[in-house]
Design a protein with these regions (language model features):
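Conserved structural elements of the adenylate-forming
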Residues: 25-48
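Conserved pre-ATP/AMP-binding loop-to-beta segment of ANL
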Residues: 1-11
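Short coil/turn connectors at secondary-structure junctions
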Residues: 19, 55-57, 153-154, 180
């Protein structure tokens, strides 16, 4: 337990759980961990780009929402940070606090468009999926061709929460500028853990002085930080100044270096498909989607996948739901490339595809489907993989009444 009275709780829906978790955010963790992480992001960015002019404008943050009762504040971590930041932070960030904390997402987006279209925005931060929806609406609202015409001084997106690779092409299309930089952070409701400190690398520096004690699980064995090995993957456990003790985050990290300690997030401990012995993990899926999109000229906005179970007369398969920002030249070619890349990456999948599994099926859903699903379910992330059909069927239910816009390819 944390000493003293805890008045802030971060609501974390995770990706696969139906129940929200309420995580304590102590004053110590708020300033020693979360706020310090934000300061270090700025410091490390300046270290990489000394000629930056990012501080000559404002940072746009698309926060969540929070509620108050009996002196207790509960909400998304982003909302708690907005709620507790001092008044002078408004000199550096946008939109106004009242707008940032609005509960209705569509109303929030419209107000941000009105308030921020004429601001000098030099950076934005947050989860890629929600920011992509906002920025696309900003381009529509202003009637411009892309975001560079709206905010010509824009240079930084500090992103976290989900893997960025599936969104990279969409952001590059929206912000066609060689001066735009993308900086990954590993921050969550539970704490702030790592920052990308070198743009030439695809990993992050593990932050060791934020009030968090790290342990790592490899199967049944748990090792301290000094016991990890480069190239190995571990489930991460933390004990921290917010009162969490040996708490398993559900993330799988891979160490790329032990001097200094560098990691990349390789996936989730519970996000996989293994209905037929194929053992497909999130990293396989993200890579396959990226390759298929590049090969067919597509931009993928969101996706999720799960099993279609075997029947008496039919083979099992993987079923994908995909929302495109730009449709592929050929849907069939996209599915074939996706399938082929999964077979190349995963020998278990290849073996099953050549025997007991049918080719994958793909549902193409209208733009905004996943955003509506997340709002309805109170989630901030789309689960990429699930070993059952609950997410698949729930997302497809969101398209009710729009069946003409939904296709199945296989």
């Amino acid at each position: 337990t944390a000493p003293g009275r805890v008045s802030l709780f971060a609501r974390s829906s995770g990706t696969t759980s139906e129940r929200s978790k309420y995580l304590p955010v102590t004053d110590v963790s708020l300033w020693r961990c979360h706020t310090r992480g934000l300061r270090d992001v700025a410091t490390l960015y300046v270290g990489q780009y000394p000629s930056t002019r990012v501080f000559e404008g404002k940072t746009l943050t698309l926060g969540g929402t929070c509620s108050k009762s009996g002196g207790i504040v509960v909400g998304d971590l982003s909302a708690l940070l907005v709620e507790r930041t001092p008044f002078w932070s408004g000199w550096f960030r946008t939109p106004r606090r009242e707008t940032a904390l609005l509960a209705d997402f569509d109303e929030k987006v419209e107000r941000i468009c009105r308030e921020c279209a004429s601001e000098r925005v030099t950076a934005f931060a947050g989860v890629p999926s929600w920011n992509l929806a906002l920025l696309r609406r900003m381009v529509e609202y202003t009637g411009r061709r892309n975001l560079c015409e709206v905010w010509p001084h824009l240079e930084l997106f500090a992103h976290g929460g989900v893997g960025f690779e599936p969104y990279r092409a969409a952001f590059r299309e929206l912000i066609p500028s060689a001066e735009m930089h993308y900086m990954e952070t590993y921050n969550a409701s539970e704490g702030f853990f790592a920052i990308a400190d070198d743009a030439s690398r695809d990993d992050m520096l593990l932050m060791l002085d934020y009030g968090t004690y790290y342990e790592f699980r490899d199967g049944d064995e748990v090792v301290p930080l000094e016991g990890v090995q480069a190239g190995r993957r571990y489930a991460m456990l933390i004990s921290s100044c917010n009162g969490l003790w040996r708490y398993e985050l559900g993330d799988v990290v891979e160490f790329t270096s032990t001097d200094p300690y560098r990691i990349r997030v390789a996936g989730r401990t519970r996000q996989f498909i293994n209905a037929f012995g194929e053992e497909v993990v999130m990293e396989n899926a993200e890579r396959a989607v990226t390759v298929a999109a590049e090969a067919t000229g597509a931009v993928v906005s969101e996706y999720t996948a799960g099993p279609r179970y075997m029947t008496l007369h039919g083979r099992g398969a993987h079923e994908w739901i995909v929302e495109f920002g730009r449709a592929p030249e050929s849907f069939d070619a996209f599915v074939q490339k996706l399938d082929g890349e999964l077979m190349r990456l995963n020998s278990d999948y290849e073996a099953k595809r050549r025997s007991t599994m049918a080719p994958p099926e793909m549902h193409v859903v209208p733009a905004g489907t996943f955003a509506r699903w997340m709002l309805r379910r109170g989630k901030n992330k789309v689960p990429r993989l699930a070993n059952d059909r609950r997410v698949l069927e729930d997302v497809l239910a969101t398209t009710a009444g729009q069946d003409a816009a939904v296709g199945v390819r296989g």
